[in-house]
């Protein structure tokens, strides 16, 4: 079995020309599978089956391997068996149809309401970039837009009189969202400045040369704003997450938040209920007279 693994690594290096880092990762992952085979008395790669791999991945998961790492291992096994089948050594793939154990879903990072206010109420310098960036920040937080929805936004999608914006979301689905008063004010300041650039199209947010802002440009500007006002990294989706979390915290209306975010499946929206519970738990721990406090003895 060792010689087949060595031959595969040689194939990756010479014919596939993978990087040394990638090659080392493949060798390490497949080496763990080989070690398992030796302990499980699997004497050839032909004898390794899906039940063996299920046992292997379960054991690795119990030992602390993340779902992402296990997915990478299974990908390495599939690539290895594709090679073995092509070389006539095996006629099967034990990893076919096998998925790694699901890990805990990471909670999205958000700003609390005080930090959001600190970001948005920090004061705006009277210049083109500052007013544009303020309008971007306010709209992202006010309406919960995705970055792609913001960059694709055109003038005819804005209705500042009624405080509405129409966006084109995933799957080319449109939805109409409210625009808060602060965002409306910021946009009313920004749009006359935008017109001075002689814009090349109907994009709401443009550069000083009148070109539509792309995702990367907005990410860079938000990162700078976060470091300046909050001393932390800030990305567009953090404002969308904050919008959803704060709205759910205040309204407790999961369906309404789902509609505003444009989620096809409410399960996607339910991640924000975990954030809300975390907030409530923090409030409870700090405010309830019989909550456990750090540094106090149990009575």
From Swiss-Prot:
Domain of life, source organism: Bacteria
- What residue stretches are annotated with the Core-binding (CB) domain? 1-85
Disulfide pairings: none
List the active-site residues.
146, 170, 237, 240, 263, 272 (o-(3'-phospho-dna)-tyrosine intermediate)
Where does this protein reside within or beyond the cell?
A: Cytoplasm
- GO biological-process terms attached to the record: cell division; chromosome segregation; DNA transposition
Residues annotated as domain Tyr recombinase:
106-285
CDD domains, per database record: INT_XerDC_C (cd00798)
Q: Which SUPFAM superfamilies match?
A: DNA breaking-rejoining enzymes
Please give the Gene Ontology molecular function terms for this protein.
DNA binding; tyrosine-based site-specific recombinase activity
> Pfam families attached here?
Phage_int_SAM_1 (PF02899), Phage_integrase (PF00589)
Q: Which UniProt keywords apply?
A: Cell cycle, Cell division, Chromosome partition, Cytoplasm, DNA integration, DNA recombination, DNA-binding
Q: Name one GO cellular component term.
A: cytoplasm
Q: How does this polypeptide assemble, per the annotation? A: Forms a cyclic heterotetrameric complex composed of two molecules of XerC and two molecules of XerD.
Family matches, as HAMAP family = Recomb_XerC_XerD
Q: What does this protein do?
A: Site-specific tyrosine recombinase, which acts by catalyzing the cutting and rejoining of the recombining DNA molecules. The XerC-XerD complex is essential to convert dimers of the bacterial chromosome into monomers to permit their segregation at cell division. It also contributes to the segregational stability of plasmids.
Q: Record's family?
A: Belongs to the 'phage' integrase family. XerC subfamily.
Protein's name in the database: Tyrosine recombinase XerC
Lineage, please?
A: Bacteria, Pseudomonadati, Pseudomonadota, Gammaproteobacteria, Pseudomonadales
In the UniProt record, the gene name given for this protein reads xerC
């Amino acid at each position: 079995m060792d010689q087949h693994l060595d031959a595969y690594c040689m194939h990756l290096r010479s014919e596939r020309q993978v990087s040394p880092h990638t090659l080392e990762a493949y060798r390490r992952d497949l080496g763990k599978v080989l070690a398992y085979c030796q302990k499980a008395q699997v004497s050839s790669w032909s004898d390794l089956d899906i039940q063996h791999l299920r046992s292997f991945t379960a054991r690795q998961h119990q030992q602390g391997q993340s779902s992402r790492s296990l997915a990478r291992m299974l990908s390495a096994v599939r690539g290895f068996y594709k090679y073995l089948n092509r070389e006539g050594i095996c006629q099967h793939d034990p990893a076919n149809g096998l998925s790694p154990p699901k890990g805990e879903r990471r909670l999205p990072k958000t700003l609390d309401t005080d930090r959001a206010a600190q970001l948005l109420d920090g004061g705006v310098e009277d210049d083109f970039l500052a007013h544009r960036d303020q309008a971007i920040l306010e709209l992202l937080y006010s309406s919960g837009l995705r970055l792609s929805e913001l960059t694709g936004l055109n003038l005819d999608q804005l209705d500042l009189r009624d405080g509405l914006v129409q966006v084109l979301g995933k799957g080319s689905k449109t939805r109409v969202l409210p625009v808060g008063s602060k965002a409306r004010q910021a946009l009313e300041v920004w749009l006359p400045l935008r017109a001075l650039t002689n814009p090349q199209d109907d994009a709401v947010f443009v550069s000083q040369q009148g070109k539509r802002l792309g995702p990367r440009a907005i990410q860079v500007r938000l990162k700078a704003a976060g470091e300046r006002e909050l001393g932390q990294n800030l990305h567009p989706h953090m404002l969308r997450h904050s919008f959803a979390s704060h709205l759910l915290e205040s309204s407790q209306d999961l369906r309404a938040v789902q509609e505003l975010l444009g989620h096809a499946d409410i399960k996607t929206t339910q991640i924000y209920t975990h954030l809300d519970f975390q907030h409530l738990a923090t409030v409870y721990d700090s405010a309830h007279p019989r909550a456990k406090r750090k540094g106090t003895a149990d009575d």
